[in-house]
Amino acid sequence: MSKSNSLDLKKIRADFPILHRKVHGKPLVYFDNAATTQKPRSVINAISDYYERYNANVHRGIHLLAEEATAAYEGSRGKLAKFIGARNPAEIIFTRGTTEAINLVAYSWGEKFLKEGDTILLTLMEHHSNLVPWQFLAQRKKLNLEFVPVTAAGYLEDPEGAIRQLRPKLVSFVHVSNVLGTVNPVKNLAKVAHEAGATVLVDGAQAVAHLPVDVASLGCDFYAFSSHKMMGPTGTGGLWGRAEILERMPPFLGGGEMIKEVSLRESSFKDAPYKFEAGTPSIAPVIGLGAAVDYLSSVGMENIRHYEEEFLEYAFEKLAAVPGLTIYGPQNSEDRGGVIAFNVAGIHPHDLATVLDQEGVAVRSGNHCAMPLHTHLKINASARASFAFYNTTSEIDVLVEAIGKAKKILKV
């Protein structure tokens, strides 16, 4: 693995305490990173440090603890902005995660700027979080929902043509599919969408911990992501939005902290990002997210991407050799993130996942919050192995061996 020799896997794995535990007496092989990633010690320590040393509310107090908490909280905003290439930390809105970030755009931007008869263009490979909010909005405002189909190879089928033909007001799509692993051509699609007069939202949940993200270069208008899928805590995440768009959007929720003035009859609101952050925020998780960004930056996103591409090549080779195993999505690691959804003929994914768990291997089974995609693939469910830069090729060998054991146990 010449490209990835800058990754010290022994040191990296030592940074993640949970990787050293056993499951059913077997070493843990954690291949469920698309659901949530594990946390390095530095993230755990950052959260503990907040609660032990400077636990206080942010923005409101003038005492030392409040000032320290505010500095750490806002420091995370600055780190995130730099990490994803935002021009200004004020373009980063903290949310509960990708789901809330997309809902924020739907309820704020969508309610204000979309009108009856307008079209929203999505794709068949979307997570439910980038589908259901638009269904709600379309039902409320009588909008048209259209979908870019997916080819048998797992790529979007002529999305540029769909954009030019349908002239949507919003194009919203996933950066990396959580089922197919497909890395979509964000920069090109954003360019075509803007030429057609559309605003562009990208679901980056499966991208930010796996490949370099630069929102300025990508050219989108919104980019949503979750902390817990980038080595950070659960309960937080973010939305990046162009400053000029955020400025025109109304608040999403009402309450404390997001206001300038309040009278009995009306209120005025702060500028972005604060007008979108009502109430006491998830302070400890945000501070932990900042520590996660520090950790990812120290490893290097280019290094992580190179390693995961080579890791995927190894995984493809080994899994393809398993009789009866079907992999869904692109077979080229350059076009794919660290996700492999698959089925083994004659074995239900839930049964397979159960046997794998007994062998210490954690995978996901089901529809992975992507029912329409599974319907399109003509399957009810799939097993999914999803990877991170702390996984090793020897763990792929364990997975393949465990699949073989499942076939014997289930007499396939």
Model-predicted regions and their roles:
Residues M1-V412:
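Pyridoxal 5′-phosphate
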